[in-house]
């Protein structure tokens, strides 16, 4: 076996079939010895690290992001290796503000790893700043099999003339409250539809009622069919996050042919270029102006240049990962 690929979900394993077609033998679940252990997400770092120690093989980590509110100015807990297992001694003070054990173990593994890869320039810089590790930028992908293009999913008749869609976890940094405040500013407020699950759901419902904004928020993860239907019916997709390591939702929206308005943060600029409208992530008046501009345009779907999405497909991601994987396996590039 070439690679033992550690992934917490289907998304983080998207490039595996293409890499197998390229000749790599990859296992998603196995204790058999492999030439390389690869953690495709922070949730798998400890398991991949300990596997690499047991089987004495190289280790590669994919670090998606390092949220500033979780690490802040704090210091990592002390992490030790005992018999190939990571053990942690918590600091009594000045530690990382949130999930100290998780990020302390990740830092230790990154400093021991043979390679650390990140999806964006922003994350590369954060890894060097917080972990003291030189990482390589290797962008991941959106699910180009699931969102193959607008021509595969023709637009449905909208249930109301103006509808605004947002798709993500319902947590504070995703910034959905800004959407509601912006919608309340419009002379003809749209239906706001938010698909996702998380602790902010009830707060958003209360805010929408206070602002008299029509909100459709099921509060549970939607099926693929429901998400495709929501994209087809929406007038615009809004991605208001204050922080991202990569940013999947706007890529999905562009692939589905939707107008997209995104927060002006570095990863959005890095991958979306001039294909979307931007707004300051704490300025609801700015977002309201961008919404008015989109709603004033004809309803036809915008054309997205293939040059923007093609480098971020599953196959393109596999092509980027392959040289690094083969190098760590000791093969000629």
Language-model regions, residue ranges each:
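Conserved acidic donor-binding segment of nucleotide-sugar-dependent glycosyltransferases
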Residues: 276-285, 292-299
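Short alpha-helical donor nucleotide-sugar binding micro-motif in glycosyltransferases
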Residues: 110, 229-234
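Aromatic "clamp/platform" in nucleotide-sugar-dependent glycosyltransferases that forms part
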Residues: 242
């Amino acid at each position: 076996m070439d690679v033992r690929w550690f992934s917490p979900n289907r998304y983080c394993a998207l490039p595996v079939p293409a890499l197998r077609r390229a000749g790599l033998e990859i296992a998603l679940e196995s204790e058999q010895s492999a030439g390389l252990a690869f953690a495709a997400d922070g949730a798998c770092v400890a398991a991949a690290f300990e596997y690499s120690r047991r089987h004495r093989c190289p280790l590669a980590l994919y670090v998606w992001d390092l949220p500033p509110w979780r690490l802040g100015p704090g210091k990592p807990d002390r992490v030790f290796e005992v018999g190939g297992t990571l053990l942690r001694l918590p600091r009594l003070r000045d530690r990382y503000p949130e999930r100290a054990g998780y990020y302390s173990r990740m830092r230790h593994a990154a400093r021991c790893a043979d390679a650390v890869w990140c999806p964006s320039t922003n994350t590369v810089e954060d890894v060097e700043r917080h972990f003291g590790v030189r990482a390589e930028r290797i962008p991941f992908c959106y699910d180009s099999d699931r969102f193959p293009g607008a021509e595969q999913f023709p637009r449905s008749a909208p249930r109301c003339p103006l509808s605004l869609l947002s798709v993500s976890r319902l947590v504070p940094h995703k910034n959905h409250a800004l959407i509601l405040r912006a919608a309340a500013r419009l002379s003809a407020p749209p239906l706001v539809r938010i698909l996702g699950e998380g602790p902010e759901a009830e707060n958003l419902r209360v805010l929408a009622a206070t602002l008299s904004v029509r909100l459709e928020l099921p509060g549970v993860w939607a099926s693929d069919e429901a998400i495709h239907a929501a994209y087809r019916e929406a007038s615009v997709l809004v991605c208001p996050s204050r922080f991202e390591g990569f940013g999947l939702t706007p890529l999905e929206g562009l692939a589905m042919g939707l107008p997209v308005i995104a927060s002006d943060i570095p990863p959005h600029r890095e991958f979306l270029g001039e294909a979307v409208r931007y707004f300051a992530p704490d300025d609801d008046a700015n977002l309201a102006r961008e919404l008015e501009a989109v709603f004033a345009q004809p309803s036809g779907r915008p054309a997205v240049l293939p040059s923007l999405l093609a480098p971020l497909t599953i196959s393109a991601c596999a092509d980027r990962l392959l040289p690094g994987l083969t190098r760590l396996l000791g093969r000629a590039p």
